[in-house]
Amino acid sequence: MPVRAQRIQHVMQDTIINFYSTSDDYGDFSNFAAWPIKVDGKTWPTSEHYFQAQKFLDEKYREEIRRVSSPMVAARMGRNRSKPLRKNWESVKEQVMRKALRAKFEQHAELRVLLLATAPAKLVEHTENDAYWGDGGNGKGKNRLGYLLMELREQLAIEK
């Protein structure tokens, strides 16, 4: 690799790409971004709709979530504790998110290109609203969404 390319790659490794709002430069990485996904024969308006619905075993309630008008409403419905959560939710939630992300980035070529173009930068869901999927706003959160996107980016680069 030429020296200049090595320097550019080194700079990119130190680069952090923050995303959260769908209006951000990388807002399409948000689960609220309006990129429909088809999973298990059903079309979901956003990956957020799909993710939130998978918390529940009640098929009727899952369908209600799928049909709501916005990812914000889907997220609110996903926090509804009057409906029982799947007992194994904590152990499967990352697997569900992986499935949603893979569908989103495989089914939309322009998103796949955008994700691949971020390598090797660190992707961070920068929000104080979530310290599990995001960075907690102060960098101390787990940033699991960012890490799952980087994992997917690596897989897609290999499959290219």
UniProtKB/Swiss-Prot annotation:
One of its GO terms (molecular function) is hydrolase activity, acting on glycosyl bonds. It catalyses: 2,5-diamino-6-hydroxy-4-(5-phosphoribosylamino)-pyrimidine + H2O = 2,5,6-triamino-4-hydroxypyrimidine + D-ribose 5-phosphate; 5-amino-6-(5-phospho-D-ribosylamino)uracil + H2O = 5,6-diaminouracil + D-ribose 5-phosphate. CDD domains: NADAR (cd15457). Transmembrane segments: none annotated. Catalyzes the hydrolysis of the N-glycosidic bond in the first two intermediates of riboflavin biosynthesis, which are highly reactive metabolites, yielding relatively innocuous products. Thus, can divert a surplus of harmful intermediates into relatively harmless products and pre-empt the damage these intermediates would otherwise do. Helps maintain flavin levels. May act on other substrates in vivo. Has no activity against GTP, nucleoside monophosphates or ADP-ribose. Is Required for swarming motility. It comes from Shigella sonnei (strain Ss046). This is N-glycosidase YbiA. Belongs to the YbiA family. The keyword Zinc-finger does not apply. It is an enzyme of class 3 (hydrolase). Its EC number is 3.2.2.-.
